[in-house]
Curated annotation (Swiss-Prot):
E.C. number: 2.4.2.29
Protein name: Queuine tRNA-ribosyltransferase
First-level EC class: transferase
Species name: Tolumonas auensis (strain DSM 9187 / NBRC 110442 / TA 4)
Name of the gene this protein is made from: tgt
Region (RNA binding), start-end ranges: 245-251, 269-273
UniProt binding sites for Zn(2+): 302, 304, 307, 333
Enzyme active site: 89, 264
Known role: Catalyzes the base-exchange of a guanine (G) residue with the queuine precursor 7-aminomethyl-7-deazaguanine (PreQ1) at position 34 (anticodon wobble position) in tRNAs with GU(N) anticodons (tRNA-Asp, -Asn, -His and -Tyr). Catalysis occurs through a double-displacement mechanism. The nucleophile active site attacks the C1' of nucleotide 34 to detach the guanine base from the RNA, forming a covalent enzyme-RNA intermediate. The proton acceptor active site deprotonates the incoming PreQ1, allowing a nucleophilic attack on the C1' of the ribose to form the product.
Length: 373
């Protein structure tokens, strides 16, 4: 992987990630394909929304179908027939989400398989081995996602273990002679001093890119913005910056304004299945009765298949009838909305008009522009 920083405007960055499997223009949003599929979508449909790179889930793909099946296909790209770049998370967040059925120790995490109840063990080394079999273009280190809220002491101990796991992840990645990219993950909760220690430790180890983890886990938006403002300027300019698990459209805009290059989130796909649709002028909850006889398109400015061919009334009808086509059409639109938003941000940085783009984005949604301070 090669990262090229093409232009900046304020703290915002316009760049390009170059992989053997394709080029990703940044800032970029990665649709989430948890089980080797973006729910309800073919790879061709996902590509048609403008997606350049997908996120796969190491934890879930390890449990099902497993490494043996993946190796028989070649790798995850062959398995799911997506031949663009793929970033895989390490499984750390999913283990964190298991709550009471997992035990975190220095060597790794012991837990019960949520599918069949079997005892199972995941370590930094094992995560690197699984991601190697997946053929991930970007591999994420195995870390512990610091919970929120957490005291300074709890966040410190969690961050320190994540740093030790980062060293082990790097070592096993190198032993496997993996030639793809390996990203470190900055932890430390909402505490700036802990974020500093985490980043310094990761820089000492050395990675191809740096992710900001442990945000969007319940903390106030002000804390997220404060941490990004503090951390991003300290990440080397020539390395990509990835904000994990974020988020809402305004979170992407605010992340870009603070120097983030990459994002992922289940929000556009999950919300689509619940009839929660993002448009240029705000959210449309298509389930609401007022759309029953609305014969206008979902978003007059959107060029997606859904908006070009169907009315709000039809989408409302599909939702009320629980037709699977409704979820598919909604997903196509939401993914295209996110990619159009990212394209708009890239074009604005290219043109030096980011402030105007941001002002228009918030005005259309009838919201004030958040301060960068």
């Amino acid at each position: 992987m090669k990262f090229e920083l093409k232009k900046t405007e304020g703290r915002a960055r316009r760049g390009r990630l170059v992989f053997d499997r394709g080029v990703v223009e940044t800032p970029a949003f990665m649709p989430v394909g948890t089980y080797g599929t973006v729910k309800g979508m073919t790879p061709e449909e996902v590509k048609d929304t403008g997606a350049q790179i997908l996120l796969g889930n190491t934890f879930h793909l390890w449990l099902r179908p497993g490494q043996d099946i993946m190796r028989k296909h070649g790798d995850l790209h062959d398995f799911m027939n997506w031949h663009g770049p793929i970033l895989t998370d390490s499984g750390g967040f999913q283990v964190f989400s298991l709550g009471h059925i997992r035990k975190i120790k220095e060597e790794g995490v012991h837990f019960r398989n949520p599918i069949n109840g079997e005892k199972i063990f995941l370590s930094p080394e094992k995560s690197m081995e699984i991601q190697n079999d997946l053929g991930s273009d970007v591999v994420m280190i195995f870390d512990e996602c610091t919970p929120y809220p957490a005291t300074h002491d709890v966040a410190k101990k969690s961050m320190e273990m994540s740093l030790r796991w980062a060293t082990r992840s790097r070592q096993r990645f190198d032993e496997l002679e993996n030639k793809n990219a390996l990203f470190g993950i900055i932890q430390g909760g909402v505490y700036e001093d802990l974020r500093d220690v985490s980043l310094k430790g990761l820089l000492d180890i050395g990675f191809d890119g740096y992710a900001v983890g442990g945000l969007a886990v319940g903390e106030p938006k002000e804390d997220m913005h404060r941490i990004l403002k503090h951390v991003c300027p300290q990440i080397p300019e020539d390395k990509p910056r990835y904000l994990m698990g974020v988020g809402k459209p305004e979170d992407l805009v605010e992340g870009v304004r603070r120097g983030i290059d990459m994002f992922d989130c289940v929000m556009p796909t999950r919300n689509a299945r619940n009839g929660h649709l993002f448009t240029t002028d705000g959210v449309v909850k298509i389930r609401n009765a007022k759309y029953k006889d609305d014969v206008t398109s979902l978003d007059a400015e959107c060029d997606c298949y859904t908006c070009k061919n169907y009315t709000k009334s039809y989408l409302h009808h599909l939702d009320r009838c629980n037709e699977m086509l409704g979820a598919r059409l909604n997903t196509i639109h939401n993914l295209r909305y996110y990619q159009r938003l990212m394209q708009g941000l890239r074009d604005a940085i290219d043109a030096g008009t980011l402030d105007d783009f941001v002002a228009d984005f918030y005005q259309r949604q009838d919201k004030p522009v958040p301060s960068l301070d």
